[in-house]
Amino acid sequence: MAHGLVTFSDVAIDFSQEEWACLDSRQRDLYWDVMLENYSNLVSLDLESPYGTKSLPTEKGIYEINLSKWNSNGKSKSLGLDWMCEGEFEGPQGPRESCFNQMIINYEKTPTCRENTSVRPHQRLHTRENSYECKECGKAFSRGYQLTQHQKIHTGEKPYECKECKKAFRWGNQLTQHQKIHTGEKPYECKDCGKAFRWGSSLVIHKRIHTGEKPYECKDCEKAFRRGDELTQHQRFHTGEKDYECKDCGKTFSRVYKLIQHKRIHSGEKPYECKDCGKAFICGSSLVQHKRIHTGEKPYECQECGKAFTRVNYLTQHQKIHTGEKPHECKECGKAFRWGSSLVKHERIHTGEKPYKCTECGKAFNCGYHLTQHERIHTGETPYKCKECGKAFIYGSSLVKHERIHTGEKPYECKECGKAFSHGHQLTQHQKIHTGEKSFECKECGKACNHVNHLREHQRVHTAEKPFEQKEGAEASIQHSFLPQHKENP
């Protein structure tokens, strides 16, 4: 690393006075520990010091910062705090400048950091010393506070509770971040698109969308990511590592939040409830997506055709229509699919697996979506409502088809004659006129028809059924009045 490229201000952590007040003594000790380590690292690498200590000669080459107490008269740029101290830097020529509180930084300007006791935390970067081991799982850490934080995963301890909603957290900084949800505070705004964020780290990650920067690269396949946690998760595909196991069913997960969500399947807990319709969900993201049914919001738009979607994964799936990409192939029959989930569902045709069972009637389905739709028959839920006439439907696809009555849209056009239809199955039936296909055959005489309704009419010849038979009186005239309609609309 070149001399002077990194200063202490580049690695300092920002805290406002209010945020600092939220930290307990252990967290403040942790803060000073980290700041000391960062400063020692810079010194040991002979990088620029914000305190100018390198220009102060001493007999031994050792410099000491003597410290005093804090006040709130200004801001320390080097620490990023809204406080500064009244103490002074004591060099061989007397007081020099303002300094840290309750910290003494000693370092010796020598060629190697290993000869200096003040840079032991830095040495662990080279030696990878992990002297603090968890007795529960064997995981080791280089710092004691890291082990303390980790152990809360096993004990379930969550000492930091939100006064607004009573939600509890393992660490204080998680609570601080969570509280911004209640206040609605989003102080970090993107200059490129105006989008605002609760946390500065979210803004930093977001900016990479505009710059295209992907600083985290996988050494195995060279795939790059915007975020470090995305890389960590990706690397588990190569290693097969799954750290978090469900004690109820043994299923393992690569991320702890996925395990937490999964456990709610066993417990039945659905903490995220829609205020509009009362429907509850296992995870918050599902609630956010559900709310778009009520608001009509479709934030994800296809740049090719302008079609918009409520979920980003729907857009990703849709875009494969334009590219024609079908990377997922069935080993049994060779059929290819755009999406892996479609392949999984398709494979159940071969295996006969139907893992999704209705608790009301026992009917089983090969995919969860079909079960969800089926359950609405029992509950009577019709979440998809037409804005024109107010008619409601069980399925979103039914609403889409219904809306074509109002719009007059007929998106399915016959390439042979140009006739258009509002539904795909109508076009399929119509095309049989051109192809001569007659797929519906009478078992009595072998006559084939191109439409199931035509077959039903024909079968009455064999059964001698006469649904529109002439009768005397008013009843006969009423029944006979339907006969012309039947002939016009076979």
UniProtKB/Swiss-Prot annotation:
Pfam families: KRAB, zf-C2H2, zf-C2H2_6. SMART domains: KRAB (SM00349), ZnF_C2H2 (SM00355). One of its GO terms (biological process) is regulation of transcription by RNA polymerase II. It is found in: Nucleus. GO terms for cellular component: nucleus. It comes from the Eukaryota. CDD domains: KRAB_A-box. Belongs to the krueppel C2H2-type zinc-finger protein family. There is a cross-link at residues 109, 401 (Glycyl lysine isopeptide (Lys-Gly) (interchain with G-Cter in SUMO2)). May be involved in transcriptional regulation. May play a role in spermatogenesis. Its main location: nucleus. Residues 470-490 are annotated as: Disordered. A zinc finger (C2H2-type) spans 132-154, 160-182, 188-210, 216-238, 244-266, 272-294, 300-322, 328-350, 356-378, 384-406, 412-434, 440-462. Keywords: DNA-binding, Isopeptide bond, Metal-binding, Nucleus, Repeat, Transcription, Transcription regulation, Ubl conjugation, Zinc, Zinc-finger. It comes from Canis lupus familiaris (Dog). PANTHER family: ZINC FINGER PROTEIN (PTHR24381), ZINC FINGER PROTEIN 585B (PTHR24381:SF458). This is Zinc finger protein 331. One of its GO terms (molecular function) is zinc ion binding. Gene3D superfamilies: 6.10.140.140, Classic Zinc Finger. The keyword Protease does not apply. Residues 6-78 form the KRAB domain.
